[in-house]
Amino acid sequence: MTKALEGVRILDFTHVQSGPTCTQLLAWFGADVIKVERPGVGDITRGQLQDIPNVDSLYFTMLNHNKRSITLDTKNPKGKEVLTELIKKCDVLVENFGPGVLDRMGFPWEKIQAINPKMIVASIKGFGPGPYEDCKVYENVAQCTGGAASTTGFRDGLPLVTGAQIGDSGTGLHLALGIVTALYQRTHTGKGQRVTAAMQDGVLNLCRVKLRDQQRLERGPLKEYSQFGEGVPFGDAVPRAGNDSGGGQPGRILKCKGWETDPNAYIYFITQAPVWEKICDVIGEPTWKTDPNYAKPAARLPRLNEIFGRIEQWTMTKTKFEAMDILNEFDIPCGPILSMKEIAEDESLRKTGTLVEVDHPTRGKYLSVGNPIKLSDSPAEVTRSPLLGEHTDEILRQVLGFSDHQVAEIHDSGALDPPRKEAAE
């Protein structure tokens, strides 16, 4: 079966997480992703957070499935020639270098366009044009500058970063959409273009409900926030609101049976208006269905702490799964707090391909996420990440069409090996 992006070739200069997230997704959809790595070193994550000595880390393997690896010293004259030929043969170049690195390599946008006018150059940077555009950015910096940290946590505590990698992986997913869009536009124009995604922009895009609340705050208190019911005045910026729901339906994380010893014995419970009467029956408060202090959503807002306190009395008598089973019968929205251990052991996620077991030649079998996007006519098969430089000769011969003699010349030039250190005199 033909893959959705079969025939698209990606020149992958990305490293760590944001860029590899993007190119891995494209590879899952069938693109031929050629990962260009430094000879002898490769992507820095190969050696970070290693759980098995001298073996590619899970950090690397789980972000680089379905790719091919070529090692190339782009400072070497022969290496530059090889890179030029790769640019001619590829559709997209993806990079997440620091600002200006591609230019210093000798391949600015203008030169790439001269080599291949159809080339799409896609870049991830920390910030867009402005006062911070030259600053180095990592995941948590992006969360802090994009509005996530200031609105995450509890009102009386520090700003918090989230466990979800919304800065790195989130921006990588945004860039992947930009690349596919540019490829589609190229079918009409015949021309390449630049695609950029800033990590600050990506985080802010995912925090849009907080930007919504910032504007609402100018017109009055945010009544669905628990501090409204507590009589605590609002300041001039959106506050941290703990586990209050960010939507129009109030929600909280509540204790379940066993919470004293199990750090994940909790459930998220949403008091959705259409099922309010069912909620009242389940928790044993039938009079709340008609009591004017509780019957209508607006009347409940100042009393959310009391209401969720009463609901929690009920959830604490049930395990999170027992509570979920009961609530689902009444169409009451809820969800158990699942630990990573529980998720990893969930067989249903393996059946859907959300989790996949991958066999690696040096580290053996490991568990990874699969493609979260399912296409009916282009099912994704997850294959292992490449060893460093594993496909170098294959790419030189198959993609660039070099002869054995030419490949030998490139090897002899040192373009595929770590730079030699000059001996001390």
From Swiss-Prot:
- BP terms from Gene Ontology: oxalate catabolic process
Cross-referenced SUPFAM superfamilies, in alphabetical order?
CoA-transferase family III (CaiB/BaiF) (SSF89796)
**Which InterPro entries does the annotation name?**
CoA-transferase_III_domain (IPR050483), CoA-Trfase_fam_III (IPR003673), CoA-Trfase_III_dom3_sf (IPR044855), CoA-Trfase_III_dom_1_sf (IPR023606), Formyl_CoA_transfer (IPR017659)
Residues crossing the lipid bilayer are none
Question: What keywords are assigned to this protein?
Answer: Transferase
Name the residues annotated as catalytic in the UniProt entry.
Answer: 168 (nucleophile)
**So where does CoA get bound?**
17-18, 38, 72-75, 96-98, 104, 136-139
List positions binding substrate: 247-249
- Catalytic activity entry: formyl-CoA + oxalate = oxalyl-CoA + formate
HAMAP family linked to this entry: Formyl_CoA_transfer (MF_00742)
Q: What is the role of the protein in this entry?
A: Involved in the catabolism of oxalate and in the adapatation to low pH via the induction of the oxalate-dependent acid tolerance response (ATR). Catalyzes the transfer of the CoA moiety from formyl-CoA to oxalate.
Q: What is this protein called?
A: Formyl-CoA:oxalate CoA-transferase
Species whose genome carries this gene: Bradyrhizobium sp. (strain BTAi1 / ATCC BAA-1182)
